[in-house]
Curated annotation (Swiss-Prot):
A Gene Ontology biological process term: glutamine metabolic process
Enzyme class: ligase
UniProt function note: Small subunit of the glutamine-dependent carbamoyl phosphate synthetase (CPSase). CPSase catalyzes the formation of carbamoyl phosphate from the ammonia moiety of glutamine, carbonate, and phosphate donated by ATP, constituting the first step of the biosynthetic pathway leading to arginine and/or urea. The small subunit (glutamine amidotransferase) binds and cleaves glutamine to supply the large subunit with the substrate ammonia.
InterPro entries referenced in this protein's UniProt entry, alphabetically: Anth_synth/Amidotransfase, CarbamoylP_synth_ssu, CarbamoylP_synth_ssu_N, CarbP_synth_ssu_N_sf, Class_I_gatase-like, CPSase_GATase1, GATASE
Domain Glutamine amidotransferase type-1 residues, every copy: 171-356
Keyword Nucleotide-binding: yes
Source taxonomy: Bacteria, Bacillati, Bacillota, Bacilli, Bacillales
GO cellular component: carbamoyl-phosphate synthase complex; cytoplasm
Name listed for the protein in its UniProt record: Carbamoyl phosphate synthase pyrimidine-specific small chain
GO terms, molecular function: ATP binding; carbamoyl-phosphate synthase (glutamine-hydrolyzing) activity; glutaminase activity
Source organism per UniProt: Bacillus subtilis (strain 168)
Length: 364
């Protein structure tokens, strides 16, 4: 069955439908990763977006029961060059087409994904919608341009209530702005006693949990749409060691007086080089964000990492308080694990802060 992708600039791409028959609407973005489509589809940071995968053949290893980054996918659609209908992998439980049908996600294959990606790189991320091949294009465009995409997607993807993931180590409050399970897995590997909490928790409620450390997760959308989280971070900063990832990094920056802005087409892929300024070392990182920290002037923040490709800010630390954040994903899922050590650095920061606190008490 034929299906079209119609973009707000009037461009039309026609190909073959797979997945569900829904005609979803969303922001059309692209991801340059060669593998990891299962993790991409289940990453809550893609909430409200139609994802184009630039690698030409997708679905080769099917969908397994282990590699999901969330229980419910929030992506609005998938666009690929060619669908593999006969996957080959011992863990495969479903084909990609079967999974999309189960989760009611529309797919489009057989279009020029290179052309679409170049268009997004030139024009920036575009609003788009799926449509049947016999629909009037002008009517589809009118509907597309009259529809405003939802904001504050964090409220859609965050946990509704707090829940524990017990361990014998440091107690970590993990604020869920659209958390990937990979972050929780990394904390569990380090035997942390984790409490996952909703995005709209207050500073007072966080501190009542008596955490050794606070982690700010990834998530979708504009960080300025989550003012309650910014206020919460202001309330806990300096009282408990803090580590933020992706959206958590942006929210931390805003709480410290920095600014953020929307990028032209964002960073989405598992091959983005990032340079650590203190050492000069370069790591390949997994990234998925459409906003960036644009200015830290007149703040107590210091840039620790930058993107090699465009010099955007990829890491921050507070000059005097135990807090640091990164824009990329050290948990990968999917992607390289070059930055996995940052979870260990977080635990070390907690231990150092505890020792300094004990020393202060002994000297008092």
């Amino acid at each position: 069955m034929k299906r079209r992708l119609v973009l707000e600039n009037g461009a039309v791409f026609e190909g073959e439908a797979f997945g569900s028959l829904e005609h979803n609407m969303g922001e059309v973005v692209f991801n340059t990763g060669m593998t990891g489509y299962q993790e991409i589809l289940s990453d809550p940071s893609y909430c409200g977006q139609i994802v184009t995968l630039t690698y030409p053949l997708i679905g080769n290893y099917g969908i397994n029961r282990d590699d999901f980054e969330s229980i419910t996918p929030f992506v609005k659609g998938l666009i690929i060059k060619e669908l593999c209908e006969l996957p080959s992998n011992w863990r495969s439980a479903y084909t990609l087409d079967e999974y999309l049908k189960m989760k009611n996600i529309p797919g489009l294959q057989g279009i020029d994904t290179r052309k679409l990606t170049r268009m997004i790189r030139t024009a920036g991320a575009l609003k788009g919608t799926f449509a049947s091949s016999d629909e009037d294009i002008e009517a589809v465009l009118k509907r597309l341009n009259e529809t405003e995409l939802p904001r504050n997607q964090v409220s859609q993807v965050s946990a509704k209530t707090a829940y524990p993931s017990p361990g014998r180590g440091k107690r970590i409050v993990l604020v869920d702005f659209g958390m990937k399970h990979g972050i929780l897995r990394e904390l569990n590997k380090r035997k942390c006693d984790v409490i996952v909490v909703p995005y709209n928790i207050t500073a007072e409620e966080v501190l009542q949990l008596k955490p050794d450390g606070i982690m700010l997760s990834n998530g979708p959308g504009d960080p300025k749409d989550v003012p309650e989280a910014i206020e919460m971070i202001k309330g806990v900063l300096g009282k408990v060691p803090l580590f933020g990832i992706c959206l958590g990094h942006q929210l931390f920056a805003l709480a410290c007086g920095a600014n953020t802005e929307k990028m032209k087409f964002g960073h989405r892929g598992s091959n983005h080089p990032v340079k650590e300024l203190a050492t000069g070392k370069v790591a390949l990182t997994s990234q998925n964000h459409g906003y960036t920290v644009s200015s830290i002037s007149k703040t107590e923040l210091e840039v620790t990492h930058i993107a090699i490709n465009d010099d955007t800010i990829e890491g921050l630390k507070h000059k005097t308080l135990p807090a640091f954040t990164v824009q990329y994903h050290p948990e990968a899922s999917p992607g390289p694990e070059d930055a996995n050590h940052l979870f260990d650095r977080f635990i070390e920061m907690i231990e150092t802060t505890e020792k300094e606190g004990e020393a202060v008490c002994q000297n008092a």
